[in-house]
From Swiss-Prot:
Keywords: Cell membrane, Lipoprotein, Membrane, Palmitate, Signal. It comes from Staphylococcus aureus (strain USA300). A lipid is attached at residue 23 (N-palmitoyl cysteine). This is Uncharacterized lipoprotein SAUSA300_0413. Its main location: membrane. NCBIfam families: SA_tandem_lipo (TIGR01742).
Amino acid sequence: MGYLKRLVLYIVIMVMSVFIIGCDKSSDTAEKSKEDSKETQIKKSFAKTLDMYSIKNLEELYDKEGYRDGEFEKGDKGMWTIYTDFAKSNKPGELSNEGMVLYLDRNTRTAKGYYFVRTFYRKDKLPDRKNYKVEMKNNKIILLDKVEDKKLKQKIENFKFFSQYANLKELKNYSNGDVSINENVPSYDVKYKMSNKDENVKQLRSRYNIPTDKSPVLKMHIDGNLKGSSVGDRKLEIDFSKRENSHLSVIDSLDYQPAKTNKDDE
């Protein structure tokens, strides 16, 4: 009788051991799968800022804090840098882009930046660059430099950043993206095909001269730590380009960094 009890106990222990080991392996596999999903990590990294879109009143950023790391000094509330530009190839070997960058200092609750117009040439010619200083008060862009061109003046004063009208909360539903990784930098990229029915695409077509019916590609790029960093680069691009050698896209970024003196080095 004692032998049978020991045998039953041994069998129970063996079954439980197999069950526990199986659960551990399943857990490890699930965890590994989760860790290996760089596409998901990239989307989650972007979601920290994109979930705030659309930011109709940019002054709300004065009361929002981003990711803080050791680069911030004690007491520094940080600075948001918001950027949007429209780039296009006018002809072979020439690229123009036009847009705005604005620095919102949470310490002083002031926002300054500039509107830029640039043309780049492939050979034998330096780029043309024009910067027009601006500031923002009461969620309104104020032009500080004198601009004779009335059309350009109006364009600057009425400028809206992509983040002010975009809605990318459905980003989590995008899947099967084309992912590329360079661990040495590190840098991470993922691309998704978009539909012309997408409201963000419709908004861009209504605001910019986009002479193509081609459905765009959403490109997400990160330089630096996926979990968050005040150092590195993070940008979103909606690319309408028809072919490899042409360029037609809208680039957007919203970054949080230690407050610093603005520099027109864009």
